[in-house]
Amino acid sequence: MVIKINQFQRENTVGSGQVLAQFHQIGAQYSFEPQVISSYGKWGNHWIDKLTAFERKLLNDSQEHPNPYNQLIMDCLPYFIGISENAIQYFQESLYEKRYDFVDQGSITFHRYHDNLKQQVVWLSDLMYDHPVRDIAEYIRVKLLEAPNLDSILLFLQDYESVRPLSVFSWRLLYARLLYPIHFYDFFAKKN
């Protein structure tokens, strides 16, 4: 199953942040949390599971196949474990934040958002149910990894907030998600 995106969303008349915020507003109207594709409120557990499995696999690979590449990965491992644990801890502390708003309810989101709404077709396999900040963080992460342009990131955030302002809780989740090195895990998942 696919979703066809309206033509107006691909034109440059509306900013990317506004389009994503409108998408999240529509997605938040979905009244049921689809358990199979939901990550809402589960980032901490997912991140812990991913870190544990990743650490176990790298240790196993380095023991079974000792080579310079695996040695380099093992040398970097404490760094990635450390920043992963920092992100997990910050996320868990953020759950105690009481300054949240209607924008913090679950919505339809993307697995890894990168201007997906500019495409003519969105595949259902790319969608999930989560906190809208997931898409904002992944958009920012890609922009930072491609060619850091803080002005375009700030414009995106301003566009988004002109439609759907973020709460303090949302900002904390955004920071936690950006802190977690998911791009590192994605890279190694593709390599193996």
Label every model-predicted segment.
Residues I88-I136:
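Active-site acidic catalytic loop and adjacent metal/ATP-binding pocket
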Residues I5-Q7, P34-I108, L155:
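ATP-dependent phospho-/nucleotidyl transfer catalytic cores
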Residues V133-P165, L178-N192:
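Active-site activation/catalytic loop segments of kinase-like enzymes and analogous catalytic loops
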Residues M1-V36:
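ATP-binding pocket architecture of kinase catalytic cores
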Residues L166-S170:
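Helix N-cap / loop-to-helix initiation motif
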Residues I5, D126, L144:
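Conserved protein-kinase N-lobe ATP-binding Lys motif
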